[in-house]
């Protein structure tokens, strides 16, 4: 983990207190806490966005019937508080604001642009053989050691990068190393693109404890279409994984590859409601 100074810790604690208030309260008190969060961001880190952006957020949080306020309520009510704080602080404060400032300084120093996020493949190995996937075509032998992963994230944090996407192969084949990495870098945010078949209660408990991991599950549509590409039984395994993640109140999404064969299905109300 990159070096963290006292002022940084104090600033992070301020944001955490306001986030706590938004999580614990409801209705008008929650909206008040979210307004305070916008005020705090504008006061301490306001030069990242223009005035119009802060006005937009105030308009959203002042209207209890806006779709975005309803979405915020769903997140704050349905996702575990530790994940809300971990992902919110790391993706927002560390990556979006503090990281942006550091990246701009590093850009001037080194004369190159610094990315906001980095995509890493911990392994080319996968437990599935999906039609058309490069992993099935090129083999399962390419690995990044834990030491390499740790070095990459440490060097990235020093440049202001705190957002990390992980694909593969299947990243959760390296489940233990990913959890170890997330624990070693508590101020970074890790987003995993996974087939979902290796997600279990033990993994979800660790994700809740750490607070800085969110998975996106690959899905091609309903069972028949999905399993045609990914293999028989995979759809039901994904449904079980989603049930487990919901039980533990994880933040997660889906990664959908749309084609001429499934685009109508994956954009249908029925499919989106299932998610």
Please provide the spans of the model-predicted regions:
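Radical SAM enzyme [4Fe-4S]-AdoMet core and its adjacent flexible, acidic
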Residues: 1-55, 59-63, 227-275
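Conserved alpha-helical substructure of the radical SAM core
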Residues: 35-191, 197-202
